């Protein structure tokens, strides 16, 4: 068994245990393997171990992998900051984007999404910690942004994403994740019909699952320590 395969098994076991502790079905939770800085060969090894969904932060690096792995039925998620000049590449090559935080970026993605492809699945990135250095829309601005994105053709608004500040304080982690879950619930009370909470990484996935995560973004625990970009 390869290291990546054994790592995937361990992460899946963590997700399943956390889900059971929360009274949830583990099948509700998608493991997104974050492959930024790792080679296409390592993504291929993860696919051989049953992994289909992969997350990337850097467009040029991701495009090379998407081309190299085009023989595999992979689902590609863009999870990094979105530059205006990269929206066409994202819209043309990815299945999901988790990091939409501005209406003009959403418009550019919609304009560039090829008509022959399924709608681009979109999550809004929310700055749940209030840190000026963090990307994301402020919680009070989520609803108008959601309305704008929902109205765009070729995009499908699915939910919310957050990257809270790193912390060993489990209660702080839970508050951040709970805040995102409550925002989603508020949108759904207004009829948005969203089903996705993208939150939780290698160090805090259990807390995220407890608070309702449906996608956990796992890099280090799958591929090992991050290589230099």
Label each PLM-derived region with a short phrase:
Residues 213-229:
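Gly/Pro- and small hydrophobic-enriched strand-loop and loop-to-helix capping segments
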């Amino acid at each position: 068994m390869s290291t990546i395969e054994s790592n995937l098994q361990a992460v899946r076991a963590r997700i399943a245990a956390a889900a059971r502790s929360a009274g949830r079905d583990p099948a509700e939770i998608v493991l997104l393997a974050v492959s930024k800085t790792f080679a296409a060969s390592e993504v291929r090894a993860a696919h051989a171990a049953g992994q289909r969904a992969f997350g990337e932060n850097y467009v040029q690096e991701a495009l090379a992998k998407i081309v190299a792995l085009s023989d595999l039925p992979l689902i590609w998620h863009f999870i990094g900051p979105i530059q205006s000049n990269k929206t066409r590449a994202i819209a043309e090559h990815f299945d999901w984007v988790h990091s939409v935080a501005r209406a003009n970026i959403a418009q550019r993605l919609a304009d560039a999404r090829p008509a022959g492809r399924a709608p681009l699945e979109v999550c809004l990135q929310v700055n749940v910690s209030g840190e000026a250095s963090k990307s994301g829309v402020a919680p009070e601005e989520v609803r108008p942004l959601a309305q704008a994105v929902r109205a765009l053709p070729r995009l499908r608004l699915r939910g919310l994403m957050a990257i809270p500040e790193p912390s060993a304080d489990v209660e702080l982690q839970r508050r951040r994740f709970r805040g995102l879950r409550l925002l989603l619930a508020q949108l759904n009370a207004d009829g948005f019909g969203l089903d996705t909470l993208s939150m939780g990484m290698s160090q805090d996935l259990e807390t995220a699952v407890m608070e309702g995560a449906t996608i956990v973004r796992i890099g280090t625990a799958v591929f090992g320590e991050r290589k230099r970009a």
